[in-house]
């Protein structure tokens, strides 16, 4: 026989559109029992004997609403509320009535989304706030990825949440986990989607190419469904509370080194509250797809028109190419580490490493223009020479 709490859970799940088989599977009871109580107007009774009326009876509909619809299971709070409505009974009868509802709610009040090995990864950002690093104020963000089955966590601090950093963080998470899941669940990020059209998600073009390259299906949370990516949200809170608070660091590199060491030695070794098993143990069961041989290029992309003298402007600076590219359009690719590569029709034509000292391109342009001016020869003109007496005669009106 099912409990009264399970009876109301069956009703609620059925109203939400779940099938009889799914309800039976979630609650661990027989399908015939589910079918029976779906159409039953009353909860099951332990005894067919006529029960005495309870002082709590008039307040049970209110209590059911508060527990099942509002999620309130604090007996002290509910006791106070029904006392305000005229209840004269004690607390014990209230607690006994609430017990089956509370137990069922703990088991499955909101249906937990459990995934199969390798099926899903959840990702999200956390805006940490402004920090001072090497004398400069920067906005710090935390990226977190969690595998749905094992709860294995990867995280990294960055100074940007733009699309290029998001893709790079995803690549590093795939490498950390040793493969790619079938699906990756996102919040409704502007770096992933271009919004919705008549309820249908419009995927960002470059991000769609990225997802296809790694072979995963991108998914976004349904609006107002906070539980959908609860695993990664809990992971974010766990990292902030147990790692970030009180951690001293002088650079982002040092902060991430400490974070990754903590993930390896603490966070991913601690048994999960739901599974009872550490993420590292369950991680061995994840069936992830292999990574491609080459990383996707997450560089910033920018097209530039080359001027007649081979120069073009990028980020407020003048750059110089050979004259053969004059009037042509080139592609500038800037990696997240600052390295810059120039391309024309898919072929690399120049590479500037941020780690090396770069000669001022403005100086190169000035030098080239000077050289070009020096190659222009002055026009040679032959002039006849005459004695000055000829010009004097001309002024007096005399002709020769």
Curated annotation (Swiss-Prot):
SUPFAM superfamilies, per database record: Ribonuclease H-like
DNA-binding region: 20-39
Pfam family, one: HTH_7
Region annotation Disordered: where it falls in the sequence: 35-55
UniProt keyword Ubl conjugation, yes or no: no
Residues annotated as transmembrane: none
Residue intervals of the HTH IS21-type domain: 5-67
Domain of life: Bacteria
Gene Ontology BP annotations: DNA integration; transposition
UniProt entry keywords in alphabetical sequence: DNA recombination, DNA-binding, Transposable element, Transposition
MF terms in GO: DNA binding; DNA strand exchange activity
Functional summary from the UniProt entry: Involved in the transposition of the insertion sequence.
Family the entry assigns: Belongs to the transposase IS21/IS408/IS1162 family.
Protein name listed in UniProt: Putative transposase for insertion sequence element IS5376
Origin species: Geobacillus stearothermophilus (Bacillus stearothermophilus)
């Amino acid at each position: 026989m099912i409990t009264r709490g399970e009876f109301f859970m069956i009703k609620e799940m059925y109203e939400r559109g779940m099938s009889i088989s799914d309800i039976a599977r979630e609650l661990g009871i027989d399908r015939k029992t589910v079918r029976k109580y779906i159409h039953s107007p009353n909860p099951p009774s332990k005894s067919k004997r006529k029960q005495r009326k309870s002082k709590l009876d008039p307040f049970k509909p209110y209590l059911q609403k508060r527990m099942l619809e509002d999620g309130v299971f604090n007996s002290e709070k509910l006791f106070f509320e029904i006392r305000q409505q005229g209840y004269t009974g004690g607390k014990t009868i209230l607690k006994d009535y609430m017990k089956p509802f509370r137990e069922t709610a703990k088991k499955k009040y909101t249906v937990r989304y459990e995934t199969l090995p390798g099926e899903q990864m959840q990702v999200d950002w956390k805006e940490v706030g402004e920090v001072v690093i090497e004398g400069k104020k920067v906005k710090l963000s935390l990226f977190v990825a969690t595998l749905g089955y094992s709860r294995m966590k990867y995280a990294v601090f960055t100074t940007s949440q733009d699309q290029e950093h998001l893709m790079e963080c995803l690549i590093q998470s795939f490498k950390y986990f040793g493969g790619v899941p079938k699906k990756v669940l996102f919040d409704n990020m502007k770096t992933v989607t271009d919004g919705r059209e008549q309820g249908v998600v419009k995927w960002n073009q470059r991000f769609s190419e990225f997802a296809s390259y790694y072979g995963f299906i991108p998914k976004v949370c349904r609006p107002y469904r906070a539980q959908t990516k609860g695993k990664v949200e809990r992971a974010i809170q766990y990292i902030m509370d147990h790692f970030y608070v009180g951690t001293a660091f002088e650079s982002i590199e040092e902060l991430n080194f400490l974070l990754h060491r903590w993930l390896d030695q603490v966070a991913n070794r601690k048994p999960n509250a739901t599974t009872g098993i550490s993420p590292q143990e369950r991680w061995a069961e994840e069936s992830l797809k292999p990574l491609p041989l080459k990383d996707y290029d997450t560089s910033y992309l920018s097209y530039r028109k080359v001027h007649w003298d081979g120069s073009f402007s990028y980020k407020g600076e003048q750059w110089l190419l050979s004259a053969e590219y004059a009037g042509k359009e080139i592609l500038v690719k800037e990696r997240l580490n600052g390295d810059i590569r120039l391309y024309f029709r898919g072929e690399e034509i120049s590479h500037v490493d941020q780690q090396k000292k770069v000669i001022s391109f403005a100086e190169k342009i000035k030098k080239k223009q000077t050289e070009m001016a020096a190659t222009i020869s002055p026009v040679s003109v032959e002039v006849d020479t005459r004695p000055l007496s000829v010009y004097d005669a001309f002024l007096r009106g005399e002709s020769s």
